[in-house]
Amino acid sequence: KIRSLIDQKSKRLPIDLHDLRHYDQDLAADLLDRPLDFVLPFQEVLSEVIQTMMDPTEFQKEVDLDGGALNEIYQVGFEGSFGPNHVTPRGLRAKLISKMVCVEGIVTKASLVRPKVVKSVHYCKETKKQVKREYRDAMSLSKDGPTTSVYPTKDEHGNPYQTEYGLCVYKDHQTVTLQEMPESAPMGQLPRSVDVILEGDLVDRVKPGDRVRMIGIYRALAGTSSGQTSGIFRTVIIGNNVLQIGKDVGGVIMTPNDIQNIRAVAKRNNVFNLLSRSLAPSI
């Protein structure tokens, strides 16, 4: 799987929970209960393994492109059976906060994909110094917590900074709304919904109307006003993987032999006559 990930230039390794349970059942259970303790170490080990399998120059390009964080260069996406953590938006309760969940529903709204700054680079002409600043928000899985959101414009002596936009690192960011399926909602009640935060390679994977399974970490975000909070938290799902429901039903599965035959037919001069005889041979 890792070799295939490198060949396809993908950034996310799918991990089936069934395989993880077969290897270590306690590890799989702890992953669902405390994903913040396991996801980043998983990704760091994955990056270290890929580093030994890739060309050093190519790997360094990936490090520079992602801002240099070893545990965020390559991600893991979980799938399989989630047991009691497999719910609908109506089943999301406080007991599932900070746990790995799988939520089924219909995508009703998808925001535009916007870049989110991960690292900014600033240059001061007066002092000839370069300053780097990394940013983490409440969506980050890091245990270090969110950083300040203040964007530096001048140094401690009042000298202005010039932002080097070409050296800054950005990450794609999108918010989608997942609503309960009509057949799953109790009769006479409105369907519930939940916001899902998608970043990196997960953006633009779904569109409104798609029936999907969203796998991610159920997080509570505190809203503050004048340094105070009401105690009511907004909850979102930090996306880890996206799986389509029923997308491959009735779809055409192409084998390498089929592709070879199609290319052979495409080289023939009488392809239109052949196609007409194949479509209506009895007329």
Q: Where are the regions that the model predicts?
A:
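Long, low-complexity, serine/threonine- and charged-residue-rich intrinsically disordered N-terminal tails
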Residues: 1-210, 215, 220-227, 231, ...
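Dynamic helix-loop-helix/coil hinge segments at AAA+ ATPase domain boundaries and subdomain interfaces
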Residues: 89-93, 249, 256-283
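Interdomain "pre-motor" coupling segment immediately N-terminal to P-loop NTPase/helicase cores
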Residues: 211-267
